[in-house]
Amino acid sequence: MENKKVIVGISGGVDSSVSALLLKQQGYDVTGVFMKNWEEDDTDEFCSAEQDIADAQAVCDSIGIPFKKINFAAEYWDNVFEHFLIKYKAGRTPNPDILCNKEIKFKAFLSYVHLLGGDYIATGHYAQTRLAADGSVQLVKGLDDNKDQTYFLYTLGQEQLRQTIFPIGNIEKSKVREIAKENNLVTFDKKDSTGICFIGERKFKEFLSKYLPAQKGEIHDENGIKIGMHDGLMYYTIGQRQGLGIGGVKDRPEVPWFAAKKDLENNVLIAVQGHDHPLLFKQSLQAIELSWVAGMAPADKFRCAAKVRYRQKDQSCEVEVNQDGSVNVTFDQPQRAITPGQSVVFYIDDVCLGGGVII
């Protein structure tokens, strides 16, 4: 470890704070860097970037490591946000956190780490790396199953993983808070952020409407009968119940309505009644833009487990790789609310193989 230089991304949260502390305790030469990836365009209550910077600075001062700030707002806009808007406009529901890890934290930030003369990059993700028998680096689930974040990291390749340390990957979240408290870090009881990567806790619909004009349209039931109006297809995600604005439809039972499908051609949202309506379930999917941690798929056809959303339990499936690199995934059990634009991520036991974007 002696003199190995690690640059840790400090977000102002408890996970990255403890990551920096542990690295320092392990004898690394540690520098904390706060990435500013979004230019605030308002002063509303949800813009907490200033507080995050102050907390990040306080943590670094407390640990006794240098603190730096870097602005990646232009890179974030070009490589994450614009892509995000294009997908939303097309009626997809993209996952910006995955793209942010790929384009910002493990690309733009990694380049900056090299400029600083860093040997390693470190983040507060709940994930682990492991050396496989063939010398490749595996991306492994975090010890805390409830917090495992490999779903968001599946685009990382060998070169990135060889230069990455996840200091809290083998620790439970409760223990992380305990360590922060014992060491008097100001972030010990700070709540976890749930907003979109770097856009914070703002009201999403309001936020999106600033950038994309919404096209209102009709909501139909599965038989094509109009039952309401929607505010714009981009605001809805498959399986969504809240915010459909359908209530008390004449001659229909008082059962909740769910968004089941988007008819993009006709700008119609199709809704069905009941959480377990058959139209909400599918047994297969196709995915594109595949990324394999090892550099290639394990085989042309293989069995594994998959998640179609963060925190979903692993689902057994068969994966078939097509000539064009896309995959067909067939699940043993039908899956609820498979959402185009979201990612499907593959696992064998606790090893993340990679993933792709659902179409």
From Swiss-Prot:
Enzyme Commission number(s) = 2.8.1.13
Q: Report keywords, A-Z.
A: ATP-binding, Cytoplasm, Disulfide bond, Nucleotide-binding, RNA-binding, Transferase, tRNA processing, tRNA-binding
InterPro entries for the chain: MnmA-like (IPR004506), MnmA-like_C (IPR046885), MnmA-like_central (IPR046884), MnmA-like_central_sf (IPR023382), Rossmann-like_a/b/a_fold (IPR014729)
- GO terms, biological process: tRNA wobble position uridine thiolation
Keyword Nucleus listed? The answer is no
First-tier enzyme category under EC = transferase
Q: Name one GO cellular component term.
A: cytoplasm
Which positions form S-S bridges?
100-197
Q: Main subcellular localization, coarse class?
A: cytoplasm
**Catalytic reaction(s) noted:** S-sulfanyl-L-cysteinyl-[protein] + uridine(34) in tRNA + AH2 + ATP = 2-thiouridine(34) in tRNA + L-cysteinyl-[protein] + A + AMP + diphosphate + H(+)
User: From the UniProt record, which GO molecular function terms apply?
Assistant: ATP binding; tRNA binding; tRNA-uridine 2-sulfurtransferase activity
Using the UniProt annotation, give all residue ranges assigned to the region (Interaction with target base in tRNA).
Answer: 95-97
Region entry Interaction with tRNA, spans: 147-149, 309-310
Q: Where is the active site?
A: 100 (nucleophile), 197 (cysteine persulfide intermediate)
List site positions: Interaction with tRNA: 125, 342
Q: Which SUPFAM superfamilies match?
A: Adenine nucleotide alpha hydrolases-like (SSF52402)
Q: Which family does it belong to?
A: Belongs to the MnmA/TRMU family.
Functionally, this protein is described as follows: Catalyzes the 2-thiolation of uridine at the wobble position (U34) of tRNA, leading to the formation of s(2)U34.
Database matches in HAMAP family? tRNA_thiouridyl_MnmA
What is the protein name stated in its UniProt record?
A: tRNA-specific 2-thiouridylase MnmA
| Organism the protein comes from | Francisella tularensis subsp. tularensis (strain WY96-3418)
UniProt gene name: mnmA
